[in-house]
Amino acid sequence: MHHDDFSLRALHDALDERRRERNLSWTAVAAEVNRLRTKLRPIAVSTITSLRHKPVGEGDGILQMLLWLGKTPESFVPGMADADSAPYRLPTLATGQILRWNTRALFDALNAERASRQLTWTGLAREIEGFTPNMLTNLSRGGRTGFPHVMRIVRWLGHPAVTFTRIARW
């Protein structure tokens, strides 16, 4: 892990602190994180509790945990100034909505910035550690991404993470 990566351990610790403050079990935390869910598979208790030791976490699930905490992705990146200020805040959702990463928008921004800097995909992969050129170009297909890697892309682009999210039906 890079010293300036999104910290899954810090996220786990924040979830655990809120859980203890509210005297909740991990099962109750998972139920609250999943509170807006209608028919898709819920985020499992083990997905939340395993963040303490995992090197990588599923991106959309972590967004739901951040929403429950009322925190931004940037607030778990060391050294991010004003990480909880308005430009970084995640939206408020209604029942049946889920916040997802918009990996196609992430690809489009990445490709545009790559071209403006006259970088090849190989050169870009060298600048954003932990990625191969194929991993970066595969973002164009949409689909899932994970933490902490996605935040390396977001930081390289210099835009708030929320810029690359979308509200979908849950």
Model-based region annotation:
Residues 63, 67-87, 158-170:
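Short C-terminal boundary/hinge segments that cap the last helix of small helical domains
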Residues 34, 53, 81, 129, ...:
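Residue-level detection of the helix-turn-helix DNA-binding "recognition helix"
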Residues 1-32, 36, 83-118, 123, ...:
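A short, Lys/Arg-rich alpha-helix, primarily the initiator
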Residues 42, 46, 50-67, 142-155:
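Short, basic-rich loop-to-helix N-cap that marks the start of a DNA-contacting helix
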Residues 29-30, 45-51, 76, 124-125, ...:
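Conserved hydrophobic/aromatic packing and binding residues within compact polymer-binding modules
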Residues 25, 34-47, 129-138, 161:
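Short, basic interhelical loop/turn and adjoining N-cap
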Residues 32, 68, 127-128:
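Residues within the alpha-helical elements of helix-turn-helix
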Residues 7, 11, 44-47, 61, ...:
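N-terminal positioning helix adjacent to the helix-turn-helix/winged-helix DNA-binding module
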